[in-house]
Amino acid sequence: MLIYNQKFSVSPITTHIPLKNVYKKLNQKTIINNALTINRFYKNKLKKKPKIAIIGLNPHCETKTKLNEELKIIIPALKKLKKRNINVYGPFAADTFFLKNNLSHYNSIIGMYHDQVLTPFKTIFGFDASNITLGLPFLRLSVDHGPNVPMLGKNKSDTKSLENIFKFINSIE
């Protein structure tokens, strides 16, 4: 899952699982595959080599303790990605990463769980984005929000995300 806006995109490593299960699903392979897939998408579809920021799992993740996921999983994954010439940076603390002065330096931001990156992203852009499913042999785009059943038939839905899908498709073809 890549939530894309022209300014930057976000991608959670884990998606729709309870927060208490996130650390159990994290591993180097998943982080590496996510970053490689984003890198390939940016190079093939957007014709640029992205700068990818990785957000840590724990508060103040820059403080390295013996038992944290950053030291065991995230930092080794970053090192392996750098050896493959992928522009990755981090891990960054989630609570301050989405400040304006940080965002202009990166094309894509990988977080460890859904709300870690989607909450600040939607606070900044609202529904001015598209949901892109990466890793498929074809391009799959969707609106960046769920079905919003309570609004069905009320003519109140924001169409910005759907409009962005068409703009995006026209911009790359």
Identify the role of each PLM range.
Residues 1-173:
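Anion-binding alpha/beta catalytic cores of soluble intermediary-metabolism enzymes, centered on
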